[in-house]
Amino acid sequence: MDFNKENINMVDAKKAKKTVVATGIGNAMEWFDFGVYAYTTAYIGANFFSPVENADIRQMLTFAALAIAFLLRPIGGVVFGIIGDKYGRKVVLTSTIILMAFSTLTIGLLPSYDQIGLWAPILLLLARVLQGFSTGGEYAGAMTYVAESSPDKRRNSLGSGLEIGTLSGYIAASIMIAVLTFFLTDEQMASFGWRIPFLLGLFLGLFGLYLRRKLEESPVFENDVATQPERDNINFLQIIRFYYIDIFVCFVAVVFFNVTNYMVTAYLPTYLEQVIKLDATTTSVLITCVMAIMIPLALMFGKLADKIGEKKVFLIGTGGLTLFSIIAFMLLHSQSFVVIVIGIFILGFFLSTYEATMPGSLPTMFYSHIRYRTLSVTFNISVSIFGGTTPLVATWLVTKTGDPLAPAYYLTAISVIGFLVITFLHLSTAGKSLKGSYPNVDNEQDRAYYAEHPKEALWWVKERKN
């Protein structure tokens, strides 16, 4: 491949930070919706599955509606991924936030089972399906856009900022539910209180749309993809044939990230209430505090990943959860409130290593002309099978085995697999250019360096297979 130093991408670090904010709003929207749903499962179950008398089965049906919706994420990933690779990242990010806001609003407006019968759970499922379809293109698009707009040397630190949106959305959901449960009676929450956060989610979506309309297309897409449209002809079968190892590593990384993520953010509140017997307000405050602490931790690990490589930070997370998952869940059963907090913090601490590294590292696994679609499909298939089903699987394991530590065994097993795959198959790309792209730099010194060292600038050429 002929090297042209004029193709080195000069990016503005300040603009890169603004892209993190604009894309992070979408993450906040997604996780605000998910957090509200997770915290209000008891009320949602009572409204949409009221004929079911058994509370455990009603809860499983409510989680099942969430899990089934995840099956639509890969379809959304295919559709939005193809559009994103062909027409640009920005158009997809604008579309997905509109669809997410609409589906969140719809859930807040739905009549209950007592009002319209079987249509109530059907409409709830359809709203979750729309949410799943739209988020199928959202997170992969946000990761791709931020990675392609950031200086290579700061890709992980800026990418970790994307997860502030994730954590902030969940924190906002947690605070709102805590406030509502404090001021409203349980009867009022079951009647109308649970709907309020879903209705307010519309305003978060509109704010995100306003910010995203101001975004420019990523420099990598403009310089390396849009100018070479003939490279889009490669199909998914060819992608799998050429890059099956990269796809496998990405799949496993998303598995251990999302099983941990959904275990802590979606299942743990229910676990603390139903197994540990903490009240809803205490649970909400605890999870909110841990999420807040995770924000600076994620930013710290993001900077660390840029210095020592994301592979080592991955191994801190997978290794830590291999050793401490069971211990953390055991601490949750302590009679001491402080010890319970420590147990939750252990899980949040190691989760923050994934929050820090995933946004900046997953997009680097694929070449520019196939990045969005391949990442989107791989990410969403993995999330659909393992992420969205985590609360359902964890609930089933406890019910089936009678062992309250069963979720910890599951988390440990996933972490062991992740540790082995990352150790033997993952290549650290921190500080390197994205595959298929010229380097992204934010100063003339780095630009001059790569101009004089083309082999380092295009390190990926020798690995390319199509």
UniProtKB/Swiss-Prot annotation:
Gene3D superfamilies: MFS general substrate transporter like domains. Pfam families: MFS_1. It is a multi-pass membrane protein. Its main location: membrane. GO terms for molecular function: symporter activity. It is found in: Cell membrane. PROSITE patterns: MFS, SUGAR_TRANSPORT_2. Keywords: Cell membrane, Membrane, Symport, Transmembrane, Transmembrane helix, Transport. The keyword Flavoprotein does not apply. The chain crosses the membrane at residues 20-42, 63-83, 91-111, 116-136, 164-184, 191-211, 239-259, 285-305, 313-332, 337-354, 377-397, 405-425. One of its GO terms (cellular component) is plasma membrane. It comes from the Bacteria. Belongs to the major facilitator superfamily. Metabolite:H+ Symporter (MHS) family (TC 2.A.1.6) family. May be a proton symporter involved in the uptake of osmolytes such as proline and glycine betaine. This is Putative proline/betaine transporter. It comes from Staphylococcus aureus (strain MSSA476). The lineage of its organism: Bacteria, Bacillati, Bacillota, Bacilli, Bacillales.
